[in-house]
A protein has these predicted regions:
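A short, N-terminal "cap"/entry segment at the start of jelly-roll beta-barrel domains
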Residues: 1-36, 88, 112, 116-163, ...
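Conserved short histidine dyad/triad with adjacent acidic residue
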Residues: 21-28, 40-56, 154-155, 163-182, ...
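A short hydrophobic beta-strand segment most commonly corresponding to one strand
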Residues: 41, 61, 109-124, 209, ...
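Short, conserved beta-strand element in jelly-roll/cupin
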Residues: 43-44, 55-71, 75, 118, ...
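Structural motif
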Residues: 48, 61, 68-70, 100, ...
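Short beta-strand His + acidic residue motifs that chelate non-heme Fe in jelly-roll/DSBH
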Residues: 50-53, 71-72, 83-84, 95, ...
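Short acidic-glycine-tyrosine-enriched beta hairpin
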Residues: 76-96, 197-216
Length: 242
C-alpha cells in the first residue's frame, strides 16, 4: 500500500549509453483510493524516443523537470500525422486511458521528466478530460500580496477519477499551511525553492505524495519564493474512505 512519502530527485540523472532512455522507479502499488498508482522519473538522451506511440489502460501525467521534448499524440502506433507539441521545464501533459502517445527528445541535451500513472474503478461520468497540455510559460500570474498563492490550471472528471485537479502554487518565505488531511491522494512536484513537509526539506525537482486521509502541512523554509505543481486525484471510492 502506497502511503505518504517524500522523494528526492538529484539531477542530473545518469543516462543509459545503449538504450538512450533510463527510467528510475520511485514507487508503485495500490493506495486507499486507487487500484494502482505508480511514479517514475526518466532521462531521455538527445535524438531518441523510448517507443513508438502506444496506448494502455492507465491514465498518465508527464511533467518535464529539466530540458525540453516533443510530445506526440497519435491515432495509432505510428508517428505519421501525429500532433506534436513541445514541452519545457515546469510544463506537463495529461494522457487519458488508451490515448496513443510518446515522447521524443529533439534538442541537443537530455530531457528529464516525471510520470504519474494510475488506474482505478471507472468513474460514472460522460464528459471526460481529453489530452491536456499545460505550458509553464502560460501559467497565470500569482498575486503579489499573498504568501500562499495557488492558481487553478484545470479540474475535470476522467475515466478513473471523479475529478483530476491541477494547480500551481507560489509560497513566499515563511509562509505555509497547518497539517490537515484530504479525502483524495495528492502529488506535488517542487519546481523551485525549498519547502518543509513531514519533517523533511524538499527542494527543486523533489516529489511529495500525500495519501488520502493522512495529515500533512507545508512551509517555505528557504530565502526565495517556492513554486510547485499540485495534482489532486479524486477517486470514486471517496465515500468508502471518508
Amino acid at each position: 500500500m502506497i502511503t505518504t512519502q517524500v522523494q528526492t530527485i538529484a539531477l542530473p540523472l545518469a543516462e543509459d549509453p545503449v538504450e538512450k532512455w533510463r527510467p528510475y522507479p520511485l514507487f508503485s502499488g495500490p493506495t486507499p483510493a486507487h487500484d494502482q498508482m505508480a511514479c517514475h522519473v526518466s532521462i531521455l538522451s538527445p535524438g531518441h524516443s523510448p517507443h513508438l506511440p502506444h496506448e494502455h489502460v492507465e491514465e498518465e501525467l508527464l511533467i518535464i523537470l529539466d530540458g525540453e521534448a516533443d510530445i506526440l499524440i497519435a491515432d495509432g502506433p505510428r508517428t505519421e500525422g501525429a500532433h506534436v507539441e513541445r514541452l519545457r521545464a515546469g510544463s506537463f501533459v495529461y494522457y487519458p486511458a488508451h490515448q496513443y502517445h510518446t515522447i521524443r527528445n529533439c534538442p541537443a541535451a537530455p530531457v528529464t521528466y516525471l510520470m504519474f500513472k494510475w488506474r482505478a474503478e471507472p468513474a460514472t461520468t460522460v464528459q471526460l478530460l481529453t489530452t491536456t497540455f499545460h505550458h509553464a510559460e502560460q501559467a497565470p500570474p500569482a498575486s503579489a500580496s499573498e504568501g500562499f498563492a495557488p492558481r487553478l490550471l484545470f479540474e475535470h472528471p476522467t475515466a478513473y477519477l471523479t475529478k483530476l485537479h491541477a494547480h500551481l502554487t507560489d509560497l513566499k518565505p515563511g509562509a505555509g499551511y497547518p497539517p490537515h488531511a484530504d479525502h483524495y491522494d495528492v502529488g506535488i512536484v517542487v519546481l523551485s525553492g525549498r519547502v518543509e513537509t513531514l519533517g523533511q526539506v524538499v527542494e527543486s525537482c523533489g516529489l511529495i505524495y500525500y495519501s488520502a486521509g493522512e495529515l500533512h502541512g507545508m512551509k517555505n523554509v528557504g530565502d526565495t519564493t517556492a513554486q510547485y505543481l499540485v495534482f489532486e486525484f479524486h477517486s470514486p471510492r471517496l465515500p468508502a474512505i471518508e
